[in-house]
């Protein structure tokens, strides 16, 4: 049965833009022993997608203010306790202790893509969440090193103990093309000053073009997991962010995974 499943997946891989048939598996192949781990990956991937969407629309709102680029610096985003996303623009002070916020954009309602932006003059000094996140981001960017294409960055809480996850992911450079791969995740201490763990998520960058041939319909995407036996947080982000919305099949050493368009992951045993 494993060989039949493999063949079905290869059909998807070879015809991702030509109306490929999705493989069908019975429930006997589902492995729910991975459910807690997969649900955690889904949760992080969904948070990455929300962060990216907030950064996009928050930036648009701030740009309408015609901001002073010398005050902009970088950006950070977070989902507040009231459920609304907030995006701030600024930079760390010379000592790296305070984050100086020059502009802020706040989501009007939960789930909304409209943000209200404001200029902060004088700049707001934050020595807490944003300062720690900014230091963690600098740690991750420095560890990742120089890049030869645009990259997006995300900083999210890693756990209740206050550590950070810093992600670097290639940004789209062409309409309708969604890059997958060439990304990394760093775990940084609560104060944002110490690198604790490095995780390479994917090696090469796949430029996924979601434009089907005339008369064809895209049914799913496909790629192999080389570095680990599990999907990555950014696999979920990729599915949630690209258009059109289609599932992604991932083949690892021991499993086939299906990432649904809502980010939920199902594991199927290969043997």
Residue ranges and their predicted role:
Residues 146-188:
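Hydrophobic, aromatic-enriched interface-forming segments
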Residues 21-117, 128-161, 206-271:
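Active-site-proximal loop/helix of nucleotide/amide-processing enzymes and allied scaffolds
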Residues 184-201, 214-217, 222:
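Gly/Pro-enriched, hydrophobic low-complexity segments
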Residues 93-94, 122, 198-207:
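Short, solvent-exposed aromatic-acidic interface loops
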Residues 2-13:
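Bacterial N-terminal signal peptides
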Residues 12-21:
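Signal peptide processing junction and immediate N-terminal pro/mature segment
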Residues 176, 180-184, 188, 196-199, ...:
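Charge-rich, low-complexity terminal tails
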Residues 99-116, 178-196:
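A short, surface-exposed beta-strand/turn
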């Amino acid at each position: 049965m494993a060989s039949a499943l493999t063949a079905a997946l290869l059909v998807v891989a070879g015809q991702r833009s030509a109306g490929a048939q999705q493989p069908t598996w019975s429930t006997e192949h589902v492995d729910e022993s991975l459910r807690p781990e997969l649900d955690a990956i889904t949760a992080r991937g969904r948070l990455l997608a929300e962060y990216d969407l907030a950064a996009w629309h928050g930036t648009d709102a701030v740009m309408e203010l015609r901001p002073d680029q010398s005050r902009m610096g970088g950006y950070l985003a977070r989902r507040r306790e009231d459920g609304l996303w907030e995006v701030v623009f600024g930079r760390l002070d010379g000592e790296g202790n305070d984050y100086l916020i020059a502009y802020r954009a706040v989501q009007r309602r939960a789930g909304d893509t409209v943000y209200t932006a404001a200029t902060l003059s004088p700049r707001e000094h934050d020595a807490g969440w944003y300062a720690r996140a900014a230091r963690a981001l600098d740690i991750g960017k420095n560890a990742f090193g120089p890049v030869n294409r645009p990259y997006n960055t995300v900083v999210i809480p890693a756990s209740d103990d206050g550590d950070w996850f810093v992600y670097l992911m290639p940004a789209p450079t062409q309409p309708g093309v969604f890059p997958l791969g060439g990304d990394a995740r760093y775990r940084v201490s609560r104060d944002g000053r110490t690198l604790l763990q490095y995780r390479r998520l994917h090696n090469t960058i796949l430029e996924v073009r979601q434009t089907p041939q005339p008369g064809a319909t895209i049914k799913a995407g496909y790629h192999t997991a080389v570095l680990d036996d599990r999907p990555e947080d950014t696999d979920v982000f990729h599915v949630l962010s690209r258009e059109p919305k289609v599932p992604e099949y991932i083949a690892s050493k021991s499993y086939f995974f299906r990432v649904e368009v809502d980010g939920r992951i199902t594991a199927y045993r290969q043997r």
